Amino acid sequence: MRDPVETYMNLVPMVVEQTNRGERAYDIFSRLLKERIIFVTGPVEDGMSTLIVAQLLFLEAENPKKEISMYINSPGGVVTSGLAIYDTMQFIRPPVSTLCTGQAASMGSLLLAAGEKDMRFSLPNSRIMVHQPSGGFQGQATDIMLHAQEILNLKKRLNEIYVKHTGQSYQAIEDALERDNFLTAEKARDFGIVDKVIDKRPEDPVAKAA
């Protein structure tokens, strides 16, 4: 029997758009990509990471100056996959705004913090969680030592990224990430992961004037 959740996730809504050549149907995510909106949803892993990186590069090629909006609802996942997205966000020329909807945990919180300064947002009932990287390995003692050292190196690198984007001291970041640390949207704002908690979309000044 198929997992009902998996079945639901595969039912991507279609939207129809009128063009001068007639009607054209898009899946909802492709239509939102036209508006420069990218969704980071579910576990962060290699396949998902590759799709996000490809979308970022495509939108940069389309317009290297126009803002990209990234909506995040993720429990985190593979560190290297998350860092591929992070590095691409920093590499491309367009500013990337981030918005947490639901949760941004582990690597999800790092991507949330990595948005353009003053363009990092959270909805009021979102949950943010930060912690140090974890991993497991079995094999010869020497190999286990090598992998343990690599995890420590990753921990240091991730701490430095949080320092860069939150403005916190290295010690404060190390203390905060020692265990699973759950933050409300307001606490994430105070910690520097987001810049603002919003419950309404800001009014368009052009529409307001009209």
Swiss-Prot record:
It is an enzyme of class 3 (hydrolase). It comes from Afipia carboxidovorans (strain ATCC 49405 / DSM 1227 / KCTC 32145 / OM5). Cleaves peptides in various proteins in a process that requires ATP hydrolysis. Has a chymotrypsin-like activity. Plays a major role in the degradation of misfolded proteins. This is ATP-dependent Clp protease proteolytic subunit. Its EC number is 3.4.21.92. Fourteen ClpP subunits assemble into 2 heptameric rings which stack back to back to give a disk-like structure with a central cavity, resembling the structure of eukaryotic proteasomes. PROSITE patterns: CLP_PROTEASE_HIS. It catalyses: Hydrolysis of proteins to small peptides in the presence of ATP and magnesium. alpha-casein is the usual test substrate. In the absence of ATP, only oligopeptides shorter than five residues are hydrolyzed (such as succinyl-Leu-Tyr-|-NHMec, and Leu-Tyr-Leu-|-Tyr-Trp, in which cleavage of the -Tyr-|-Leu- and -Tyr-|-Trp bonds also occurs). The active site is at S106 (nucleophile), H131. Gene3D superfamilies: 2-enoyl-CoA Hydratase, Chain A, domain 1. Keywords: Cytoplasm, Hydrolase, Protease, Serine protease. It is found in: Cytoplasm. GO terms for molecular function: ATP-dependent peptidase activity; ATPase binding; serine-type endopeptidase activity. Its main location: cytoplasm. GO terms for cellular component: cytoplasm; endopeptidase Clp complex. HAMAP family: ClpP. One of its GO terms (biological process) is protein quality control for misfolded or incompletely synthesized proteins. Belongs to the peptidase S14 family.
